[in-house]
Regions:
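Helix-to-beta-strand junctions that scaffold the AdoMet/dcAdoMet cofactor pocket
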Residues: 61, 119-120, 133-134
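A short acidic, Gly/Pro-enriched loop at the edge of an enzyme's catalytic core
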Residues: 100-109
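A short SAM/SAH-binding and catalytic strip from SAM-dependent methyltransferases
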Residues: 108-122
Length: 183
C-alpha cells in the first residue's frame, strides 16, 4: 500500500473512532442500500483499529463473520481489543497490505472505508475485492471527495486544512477526489 498520510496505530485510533461515530448513521444507510444482511460473510479491508468493524460485526450477527484486514499490526491489535471489549466474537483478523491481500470467492460482502483515496493504484485493490467476493456478492466502497468539503460560514483555517490534506494525499500518490469516481 502507499503511505497512509494520517496518524494510525494507537495515536490515530481516537480520531478514527470519532469519525466512525459521527458517520455511523450514514454508514448503516449505505449498508442498507448495498443489501448487507444478517448472516453475511464480510471482508473489512483497511479496517484500522476496528471502529467500523464493530458495527459491521453486529450488523451480520452471530451467524455472519467479518475478516478485518489492515497492514498496521498495531491497528489490528487495537481492533482485537475493541472486539473483546464489545463482546464480539465473529471477527477474525489478518495483517496484510491491501495490494497483497488474496482471497477467492470467500465473501458475500467486501467493504472498504476511507482507504482507496490514499492509494496510487486503487483499481488493483478493487480487483482484489472483486476476486474476494462470491458470485452475486457485493463490493461496497465508502470514500471521499475532498473537493466537496466545505465550511459555512467560510473559515480560512478549515480551507487551509482541506487544501493541505489534499496536497499531502496527492504527494503520496493518492487521489483526494476519488470518491466522485465511485458508482
Amino acid at each position: 500500500m502507499d503511505r497512509y498520510v494520517l496518524r494510525g496505530g494507537e495515536r490515530g485510533a481516537d480520531r478514527l473512532g470519532l469519525l466512525a461515530d459521527a458517520d455511523g448513521g450514514a454508514t448503516s444507510a449505505f449498508w442498507d442500500r448495498a443489501g448487507l444482511a444478517g448472516g453475511a460473510h464480510c471482508l473489512d479491508l483497511g479496517c484500522g483499529p476496528g471502529a467500523v468493524t464493530v458495527a459491521l460485526a453486529r450488523r451480520v450477527g452471530p451467524a455472519g463473520t467479518v475478516l478485518a484486514v489492515d497492514r498496521d499490526d498495531v491497528a489490528i491489535e487495537l481492533a482485537k481489543r475493541r472486539m473483546a471489549a464489545a463482546g464480539i466474537s465473529n471477527v477474525s483478523y489478518a495483517v496484510a497490505d491491501a495490494y497483497d491481500f488474496v482471497a477467492t470467492d470467500e465473501f458475500d460482502f467486501a467493504y472498504s472505508r476511507l482507504l482507496l483515496h490514499h492509494l496510487s493504484r486503487p483499481a488493483e485493490v478493487l480487483q482484489r475485492m472483486w476476486e474476494a467476493v462470491r458470485p452475486g456478492g457485493v463490493i461496497a466502497v465508502d470514500d471521499v471527495d475532498f473537493d466537496g468539503a466545505f465550511c459555512h460560514p467560510p473559515d480560512d483555517g478549515f480551507s487551509f486544512w482541506r487544501d493541505r490534506y489534499a496536497q499531502v494525499v496527492r504527494h503520496h500518490g493518492g487521489d483526494p477526489t476519488l470518491g466522485r469516481t465511485l458508482v
